[in-house]
Structure formats: structure tokens, C-alpha cells
């Protein structure tokens, strides 16, 4: 749908309707239905074809002065009739930079590189503890920490550009879950370096999933039901709970690998690392369960405000309850 809208030109809503009660903007294809009259109608219907015509000439002459003047004219029209909702120059510049650098598309590769290298050297250190290895591991630890800082700045930038918390759709939820996973991985880094490396690996996998072809990364307006302060509270808590759960998953997998490679010669060192990972795993699952439970109660409050009932046994509510029960059983059965 996004590609179709872009190719047809419908996504380019660049003309504000003067004095519209809802500050509506329309694309060139929608001008006939916009109800513009007089000079406004003449200007909006002629300026874009004229601009594209000058661009064609500019390609041949390599002089874009006329095109730039027409573009500035459109900019002036937007400022005059759409100032109420038009983003500030700072926000526009930031969005251009955000799309230009596309941080979230590059982060999976960087996280994956840091994770694999740190995992390799950390596993080698289990068998041969050398000062040089510790320096290399700490270097990759810092590298992953810098990636997390960049990840955080990307989320903050998207928040500022969109004007709402960046976990309102599938794409934003995925990059936020990835952030939460890496956050808790770094929070537990004092206990085990394997935790940081494992967290970076699963973070890379989660971020890569955000770029599946059915997921739309567009920054869009909130749906009416999501335009609530509960988006900041309920969704932030319940979606962030997936972070420690994802951390628990990857730590469990790494623990199984260590158990598989344990033998009589390395049993003592392996057991120590497995025990550390097990403690961290228990803490991660406990934190995740607490956040999921709190988030579920907050969701009930939001549902009551939006639909007049706390619980309706819809798929999301039902599976949230099932998840709470499953993780509660796992934690109490340890």
C-alpha cells in the first residue's frame, strides 16, 4: 500500500487547504475533491506540473535555480496556509537525517558482528584466561554499548519526529523490544560477559525481523484508540517485558550449548559459567513476569476507559494471561 501510494503520488500531501477546520492537506491527485477556489485552485493545479517540467530541463542544463524557486514557492504556500500543523524546521531536518542514515536498518549487522566476535573471544577465555583476551572482550563490550546508545538516540529521534511514543505499531514495537532486550543484557553485564554477547545476538535477530516486507516502517499518525496516555504506560511496560523474556531464551540456549561441550577437563569452569547464566536467566524471567503482569493490569484499566470493560477474553488478553501462567509456573518450578 505504501509503495502504491508513493508511485501514484497520493502519499505526497503537500497542499494545505486554506482555513480548513481540521487543517487537512491533500495531494495533487486529490485537488479536484478539495474544494479550492480562485487563485488557490489555479496555483495548486499548475505549480507541480511546472516544477517537474523545470526539473526535466535542469537535468539537461544542470541549472536548478528555477526549480529551487518553485520549490520555495510551495514551501511558502505551506507556511501560509498550513502553519498550524506544519512541522518545525528542526523537526523536518531531523526527519531528513533520520531517513538518510536509516540507523535501524544498519544496526542489525553491527550488533551481529559485535555479538559473534564477543561470543568467540568470551568462549575462548573460558578455556584460556589471558589479559589480551580480556582487553579484546572489553573492547567489543564498549562497541556494543555504543550501538545501544545509537539505538536509543534513534528511538528518541523517532519519538520527537512522530510526536508520540515509538511503540504504536508493529515496526516500532519490534525496534522497542530489541532495545529492551539489549537494555537488560547490559544491565546484567557485570555477572557474565556471555550475557551481553548473547543479548546483542538476539537483538540483531529482532531488528532484522523489523524489515520483513509486510512490516511498514512509515512514521504515521496514531490511530484514535491509541491516542491516549495509556500508550506511554501500558504498552511501554508490557512490550518491554518481552526484552527480559528474549534474554532468558537466548541465555537458556547458550547454557544448553555449554552443557553440551562440558567434559572432565573443563567441567569446573563450565559449571561456573552455567551457574552464572542460570542466575541471570532466573532474574530476567522474574523481571519479565513482573512487568508482564503489571502491564496486563494496566491494559485492563485502558480497556475500561476505551470500551467500558476491564476484560473481554479477546486473543490479546487471553494470550497475555496464558503467558503469565506459563512463566509463573516455570519460575516457581525452578
Summary of predicted features, one role per range:
Residues 1-97:
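Soluble extramembrane regions of membrane proteins in the secretory/endomembrane system
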Residues 65-72, 134-140, 278:
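Short, charged, amphipathic alpha-helical segments
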Residues 85-116:
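Cytosolic-side membrane-insertion boundary helix
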Residues 97, 227-231:
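Membrane-interface segments at the starts/ends of alpha-helical transmembrane spans
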Residues 104-127, 137-164, 168-220, 230-262, ...:
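Hydrophobic cores of alpha-helical transmembrane segments in multi-pass integral membrane proteins
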Residues 262-274:
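Juxtamembrane inter-helical linkers in multi-pass membrane proteins
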Amino acid at each position: 500500500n505504501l509503495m502504491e501510494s508513493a508511485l501514484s503520488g497520493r502519499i505526497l500531501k503537500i497542499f494545505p487547504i486554506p482555513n480548513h477546520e481540521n487543517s487537512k492537506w491533500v495531494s495533487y491527485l486529490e485537488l479536484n475533491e478539495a474544494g479550492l477556489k480562485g487563485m488557490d485552485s489555479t496555483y495548486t493545479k499548475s505549480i507541480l506540473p511546472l516544477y517537474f517540467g523545470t526539473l526535466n530541463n535542469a537535468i539537461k542544463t544542470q541549472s536548478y535555480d528555477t526549480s529551487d524557486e518553485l520549490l520555495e514557492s510551495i514551501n511558502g504556500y505551506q507556511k501560509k496556509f498550513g502553519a498550524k500543523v506544519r512541522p518545525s524546521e528542526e523537526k523536518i531536518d531531523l526527519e531528513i537525517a533520520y531517513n538518510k542514515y536509516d540507523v535501524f536498518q544498519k544496526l542489525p549487522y553491527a550488533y551481529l558482528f559485535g555479538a559473534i566476535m564477543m561470543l568467540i573471544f568470551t568462549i575462548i577465555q573460558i578455556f584460556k584466561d589471558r589479559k589480551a583476551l580480556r582487553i579484546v572482550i572489553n573492547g567489543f563490550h564498549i562497541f556494543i554499548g555504543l550501538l545501544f546508545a545509537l539505538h536509543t538516540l534513534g528511538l528518541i529521534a523517532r519519538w520527537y519526529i512522530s510526536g508520540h511514543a515509538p511503540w504504536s505499531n508493529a515496526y516500532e514495537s519490534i525496534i522497542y523490544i530489541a532495545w529492551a532486550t539489549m537494555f537488560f543484557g547490559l544491565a546484567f553485564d557485570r555477572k557474565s560477559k556471555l550475557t551481553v554477547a548473547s543479548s546483542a545476538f538476539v537483538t540483531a535477530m529482532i531488528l532484522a525481523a523489523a524489515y520483513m516486507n509486510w512490516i511498514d516502517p512509515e512514521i504515521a499518525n496514531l490511530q484514535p484508540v491509541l491516542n491516549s496516555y495509556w500508550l506511554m504506560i501500558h504498552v511501554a511496560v508490557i512490550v518491554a517485558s518481552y526484552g527480559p523474556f528474549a534474554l532468558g531464551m537466548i541465555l537458556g540456549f547458550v547454557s544448553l550449548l555449554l552443557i553440551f561441550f562440558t567434559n572432565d577437563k573443563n567441567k569446573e569452569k563450565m559449571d561456573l559459567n552455567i551457574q552464572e547464566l542460570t542466575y541471570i536467566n532466573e532474574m530476567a524471567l522474574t523481571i519479565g513476569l513482573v512487568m508482564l503482569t503489571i502491564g496486563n493490569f494496566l491494559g485492563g484499566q485502558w480497556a475500561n476507559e476505551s470500551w467500558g470493560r476491564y476484560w473481554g477474553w479477546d486473543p490479546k488478553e487471553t494470550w497475555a494471561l496464558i503467558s503469565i501462567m506459563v512463566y509463573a509456573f516455570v519460575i516457581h518450578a525452578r
